[in-house]
Design a protein with these regions (language model features):
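Hydrophobic/aromatic residues positioned on beta-strands within the core alpha/beta folds
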Residues: 79-81
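C-terminal output helix
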Residues: 104-117
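CheY-like receiver
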Residues: 120-131
């Protein structure tokens, strides 16, 4: 089960994403945050596998976010989540693993989260016998 932190300053959107994530047994929503201060505290305390991060979340310049988060949890998968499609290039340049536009259909959002989590699992599994 992949442990997910959901970070967005819009409570309605957090609620919708929570309901969406709860439809999948492979995800465990371990925490929610509404600003970067809470994100940093939750990441440090809970050590999630993945964060769905509102790219415009208040609290810290975007150019520092991914590096600060990975300093706390090196294996953390970062999904940049934004209403602005033009943020995609910036998100990847700053180290995000996946970009999701908030206007995308729920099935696409779930698929992207699932793919990045499966990618981590396949990298962690050895491809040779363990004799």
């Amino acid at each position: 089960m992949k442990r997910i932190l959901l970070a967005d300053d819009n409570p309605g959107l957090r609620s919708a994403l929570r309901l969406l994530l709860e439809t999948r047994l492979e995800f465990e929503l371990i925490a929610e945050a509404c600003d970067m201060e809470h994100v940093l505290a939750q990441v440090e305390d809970a050590h999630p596998d993945c964060i769905v991060l509102d790219w415009e979340l208040p609290g810290r310049p975007t150019r520092e976010r991914v590096s600060v988060l990975r300093a706390l949890v090196p294996h953390l998968k970062v999904i940049a989540f934004s209403v602005r499609e033009e943020s995609e290039q910036d998100a990847f340049a700053e180290g995000a693993d996946v970009f999701v536009c908030k206007s995308e259909p729920p099935t696409i959002i779930l698929d992207k989260i699932q793919k990045i989590c499966q990618q981590e699992e396949s990298l962690a599994k050895p491809t040779y016998p363990l004799d």
